[in-house]
């Protein structure tokens, strides 16, 4: 078992959270899996709708622009040739086939587990008590949210907040308080986590309930 400290809204230690050893990956393992997962995320965000017209598709007459000989110019066949303005494109992009990259659920969950374990091992993940997300603020106050980050010694740069979906009705004050901080990259929920968000974020603040539920979900996927 690995013990992680959890903090309250004032930066004081409020207990510990246990994570099984199976959650953590060995150093250097799974790098190719993570790379494939991130490439799939980036590729599937593209529209793949880029399309150009070649010389047979552009609207031009097939008449020769000038006679073959006697003008001193290089011979030309028609204005649809790619060297002319408005002519066709050579080797341009075409939506030839579905370029959606598939990755199965087991690979996705394994990649997310590897990324989370890396954040924990490099001390870039802070576990917050559930009260931080639900009962810490009665109204949105950006100043108080910033004070919480500083009290937990969180580097104010690229911070991602992760909460449990069951707290969605009670964490609005904190979400609105964080919205005006440039250092906060986003606010999401554990079961909706995206591996690209984990890579892009420098630091992660996660609620105890979200971490327990997410870790249990990811570990159970290893046994399937």
UniProtKB/Swiss-Prot annotation:
Disordered as annotated region, ranges: 54-73
TM regions (residue ranges): none
One GO cellular component term: ribonucleoprotein complex
Pfam families named in the record: Ribosomal_L4
One term of GO molecular function: rRNA binding
Gene3D superfamilies: 3.40.1370.10
Recorded superkingdom: Bacteria
Single Gene Ontology BP annotation: translation
Keywords: Ribonucleoprotein, Ribosomal protein, RNA-binding, rRNA-binding
Annotated family: Belongs to the universal ribosomal protein uL4 family.
Subunit-structure text: Part of the 50S ribosomal subunit.
PANTHER family: 50S RIBOSOMAL PROTEIN L4, LARGE RIBOSOMAL SUBUNIT PROTEIN UL4M
Purpose: One of the primary rRNA binding proteins, this protein initially binds near the 5'-end of the 23S rRNA. It is important during the early stages of 50S assembly. It makes multiple contacts with different domains of the 23S rRNA in the assembled 50S subunit and ribosome.
The protein's name: Large ribosomal subunit protein uL4
Encoding gene per record: rplD
């Amino acid at each position: 078992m690995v013990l992680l400290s959890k903090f309250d809204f004032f930066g004081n230690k409020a207990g510990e959270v246990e994570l099984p050893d199976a959650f953590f990956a060995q150093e250097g393992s799974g790098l190719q899996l993570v790379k494939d997962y991130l490439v799939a995320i980036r590729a599937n965000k593209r529209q793949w709708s880029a399309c150009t017209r070649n010389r047979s598709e552009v609207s031009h007459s097939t008449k020769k622009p000038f006679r073959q000989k006697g003008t001193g110019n290089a011979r030309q066949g028609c204005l649809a040739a790619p060297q002319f303005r408005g002519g066709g494109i050579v080797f341009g992009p075409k939506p030839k086939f579905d370029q959606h990259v598939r990755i199965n659920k087991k690979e996705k969950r394994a990649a997310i587990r590897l990324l989370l374990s890396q954040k924990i091992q490099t001390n870039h993940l802070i576990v917050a008590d559930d009260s931080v997300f639900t009962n810490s603020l009665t109204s949105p106050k950006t100043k108080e949210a910033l004070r919480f980050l500083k009290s937990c010694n969180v580097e104010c740069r690229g911070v991602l907040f992760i909460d449990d979906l069951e707290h969605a009705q009670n964490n609005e004050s904190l979400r609105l308080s964080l919205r005006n901080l440039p250092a906060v990259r986003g606010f999401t929920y554990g079961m909706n986590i995206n591996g690209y968000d984990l890579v892009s974020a420098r630091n992660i603040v996660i609620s105890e309930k979200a971490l327990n539920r997410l870790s249990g979900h990811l570990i159970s996927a290893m046994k399937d």
